[in-house]
């Protein structure tokens, strides 16, 4: 019936055709085509595109492939080039910029035929090596460039991925070493020849179709297909080259004329010409007619054996490389040598023309070097002197011309690619980290988890100590180099109690939590022991006082232990140069308490009404620099003559804050003790040429007590006027006070801070200690020189030895 009527179980005339997906569209959805709207297509078969990509040795062998390694992705560049080619003409195309961000705009090699230098492959990508280490004699790419096939000494085929360069599969192809590999022009057959003289036929799926013996018990060194793929030629160590019929596996011609082994062979790309190279030094290169088997020409320019010959695709140029370290190019139209290329230091073993650029070729040497050449220049345009450790037996370009594979006698197969935008020619292995080079590769690399903070790093950050004259510790120096903000300004110099550095403490502490701090250096501990031993402060010294207004610790006998006075400034770590620690009370009880010292110091000048009360002492002077970091001390009970604490400028560095008021009884708990040490950043030196630092070269520790004590900085001479001032001290003028006469700059004796002067029995001891009361530190020797040393006891042990330990080292 016509129209819409149907008979019985007749199906409607609807053709649903499912287009099978090719290998390049494996993940795409199948297309459903409705052809019932077109009656003329009713009886036509649906055209199915063949799989032209050739999937190689089967998909079942790829289940262990993991594309997680670094690879060369040329698909995006090709797609961008095809898209931009539709609307860009000539000079409008995007230029490649020297940055990795422009990598996507890189164009394939065939899009720039006028710029062959873009295909100088000097960037190392990856090394491929079999589990069984053996020399690689031959390499060849699959026709579509998806895989690289290598033949090694063990007779195995190894397939490597052409994008990620990882291992895919391996199979035993021959019983002896594979010496040659060659694909047919129709890309359907692969020929392989081995050391035993056998030739095998292989299909693209690595199926062995046929095998025969071409040269009996002699190695086959080369293979060459005819342009029509009907015939092929072999070169052998028996001194002959033979022409074979591919379909019938029969020998057609034997080319005899060389007096030694024939090492290489190549067939002309369009004509019936065969070129062979031999170890015969008299007839190294010959041109043959495969139909008649006669020799057409002999090229004798090489003075040694020839290891490689290859025709250019234009059919006019012939390259030869020999053991004389030379590469020669001949024009076969004139049978004349055109150029000679000299750069190799050893024999030339392999040659390869670029598949896209006609005038570019590469040569491999016996020393593992790779050299890139242009036919119009005698000097190389690219050189990799140590690409391999040994001779390069074979090298092949990728069909697109952007990758070069080399097989060497050092058991390695290496891949070389073009430089990315921004890479330098010298950076062969991609080691440069400047700009954005290698940034994408670093993002893909796994990162190490930060180490867990130890007990030391979990504590509150304490500023590091700095000893003048000893230099910076290594970790502190490295820390400064990492922090550019601290190195660009002069206000961040590391000195004791530098408030600017305290402001940077949170910043530094955040970085130090991830750094394992090294132990204290031996030089630093040795310096502290020398300092404690040489200071020589024993019983009756300045550190052990019985001031009622003092701020020390009391022992069982009522004595007080005050902080030591040193010229290094108040230590930032709590007293010790190595770190804070608490003194042990039993160590202090062994020191006999001195007598109470009262009265003004000998060189103390007083200005204003006298102080009332014989037992009134002076608290430590206030800290300079204003109220930074909470260091300002609140004034104690009472006032200085009812006028408040004296204020004045000291060297132009802020206001002196504090009070010399009398204190009755113990101080309040909320008052924090501030050590009355010297801030040598603002105090003048004893001489014009002095820096005020510790001179380690002149320190003499453990000096015997006989005679005058040794001084590494001698006390200034005492004049007649100064002696009278010590007997009758004038009033203090805080506004115009010589820093050397400032009571804060003295060695810190408590008897110098008493307004009523020392008792007569102590004046004599003060006179005997002459040089010990100067404002610069002295070194004394004695049997009990380490007893009562507060700075050393806080470091731990008797005499300041060790860190929190009671016994010496």
Swiss-Prot record:
UniProt biased composition (Pro residues): 591-603
Subcellular location: Nucleus speckle
InterPro entries per record: Pfs2-like, WD40/YVTN_repeat-like_dom_sf, WD40_repeat_dom_sf, WD40_rpt
Pfam families: WD40
Main location: nucleus
Described function: Essential for both cleavage and polyadenylation of pre-mRNA 3' ends. Involved in neuron development, probably by regulating pre-mRNA 3'-end processing.
Name under which the protein is recorded: pre-mRNA 3' end processing protein pfs-2
Organism of origin: Caenorhabditis elegans
Gene that this polypeptide is encoded by: pfs-2
């Amino acid at each position: 019936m016509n129209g819409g009527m149907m008979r019985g179980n007749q199906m409607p005339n609807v053709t649903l055709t499912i287009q099978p997906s090719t290998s390049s569209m494996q993940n795409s959805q199948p297309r459903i085509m409705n052809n019932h709207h077109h009656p003329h297509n009713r009886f036509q078969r649906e055209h199915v595109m063949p799989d032209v990509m050739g999937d190689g040795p089967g998909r079942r062998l790829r289940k262990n492939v993991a594309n997680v390694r670094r690879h060369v992705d040329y698909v995006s560049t090709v797609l961008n080039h095809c898209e931009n080619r539709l609307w860009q003409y000539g000079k409008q195309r995007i230029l490649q910029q020297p940055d990795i961000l422009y990598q996507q705009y890189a164009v394939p090699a065939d899009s720039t035929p006028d710029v062959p230098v873009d295909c100088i492959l000097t960037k190392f990508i990856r090394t491929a090596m079999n589990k069984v280490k053996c020399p690689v004699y031959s390499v060849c790419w699959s026709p579509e460039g998806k895989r690289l096939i290598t033949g090694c000494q063990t007779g195995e085929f190894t397939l490597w991925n052409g994008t990620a360069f990882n291992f895919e599969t391996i199979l035993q192809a021959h019983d002896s070493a594979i010496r040659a590999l060659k694909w047919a022009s129709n890309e359907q057959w692969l020929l392989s020849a081995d050391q035993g003289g056998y030739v095998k036929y292989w299909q693209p799926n690595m199926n062995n179709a046929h095998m025969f013996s071409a040269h009996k018990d002699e190695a086959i060194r080369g293979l060459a297909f005819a342009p029509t793929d009907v015939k092929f030629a072999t070169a052998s160590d028996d001194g002959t080259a033979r022409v074979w019929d591919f379909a019938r596996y029969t020998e057609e011609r034997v080319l005899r004329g060389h007096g030694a082994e024939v090492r290489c062979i190549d067939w002309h790309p369009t004509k019936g010409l065969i070129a062979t190279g031999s170890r015969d030094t008299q007839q190294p290169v010959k041109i043959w007619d495969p139909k008649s088997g006669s020799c057409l020409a002999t090229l004798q320019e090489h003075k040694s054996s020839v290891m490689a010959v290859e025709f250019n695709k234009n059919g006019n140029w012939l390259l030869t490389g020999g053991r004389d370290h030379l590469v020669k190019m001949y024009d076969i139209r004139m049978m004349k040598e055109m150029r000679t290329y000299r750069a190799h230091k050893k024999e030339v073993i392999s040659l390869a023309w670029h598949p896209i650029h006609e005038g570019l070729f590469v040569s491999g040497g016996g020393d593992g070097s790779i050299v890139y050449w242009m036919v119009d220049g005698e000097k190389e345009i690219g050189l990799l002197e140590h690409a391999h450790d040994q001779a390069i037996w074979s090298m092949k370009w990728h069909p697109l011309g952007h990758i070069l594979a080399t097989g060497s006698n050092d058991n390695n197969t290496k891949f070389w690619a073009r430089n990315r935008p921004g890479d330098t020619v010298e950076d062969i292995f991609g080691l440069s980290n400047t700009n954005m080079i290698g940034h994408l590769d670093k993002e893909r690399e796994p990162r190490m988890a930060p180490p867990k903070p130890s007990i030391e790093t979990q504590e509150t950050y304490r500023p590091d100590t700095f000893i003048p004259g000893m230099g910076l510790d290594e970790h502190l120096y490295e820390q400064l180099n990492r922090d550019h903000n601290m190195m660009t300004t002069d206000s961040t110099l590391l000195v004791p109690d530098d408030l600017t550095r305290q402001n940077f403490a949170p910043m530094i502490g955040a970085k130090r939590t991830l750094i394992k701090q090294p132990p204290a250096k031996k030089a630093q501990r040795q310096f502290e022991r020398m300092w404690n031993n040489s200071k020589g402060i024993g019983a009756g010294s300045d550190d052990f006082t019985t001031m009622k207004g003092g701020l020390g610790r009391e022992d069982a006998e009522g004595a007080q232990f005050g902080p030591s006075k040193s010229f290094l400034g108040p230590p930032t770590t709590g007293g010790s140069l190595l770190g804070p620690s608490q003194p042990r009370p039993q160590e202090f009880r062994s020191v006999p308490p001195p007598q109470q010292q009262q009265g003004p110091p000998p060189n103390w000048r007083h200005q204003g009404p006298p102080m009332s009360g014989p037992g009134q002492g002076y608290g430590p002077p206030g800290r300079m620099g204003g109220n930074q970091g909470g260091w300002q001390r609140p004034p104690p009970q009472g006032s200085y003559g009812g006028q408040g604490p004296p204020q004045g400028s000291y060297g132009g560095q802020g206001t002196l804050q504090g009070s010399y008021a009398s204190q009755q009884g113990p101080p309040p708990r909320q008052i924090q003790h501030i050590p009355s040490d010297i801030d040598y950043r603002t105090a003048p030196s004893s001489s014009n040429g002095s820096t005020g630092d510790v001179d380690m070269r002149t320190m003499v520790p453990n000096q015997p007590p006989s005679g005058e004590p040794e001084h590494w900085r001698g006390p200034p001479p005492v004049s007649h006027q100064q002696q009278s001032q010590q007997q009758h001290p004038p009033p203090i003028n805080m506004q115009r006070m010589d820093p050397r006469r400032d009571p804060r700059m003295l060695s810190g004796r408590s008897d110098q801070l008493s307004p009523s002067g020392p008792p007569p029995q102590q004046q004599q001891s003060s006179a005997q200690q002459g040089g010990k009361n100067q404002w610069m530190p002295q070194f004394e020797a004695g049997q009990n020189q380490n007893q009562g040393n507060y700075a050393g006891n806080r470091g731990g042990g008797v005499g300041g030895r060790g860190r929190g330990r009671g016994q010496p080292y």
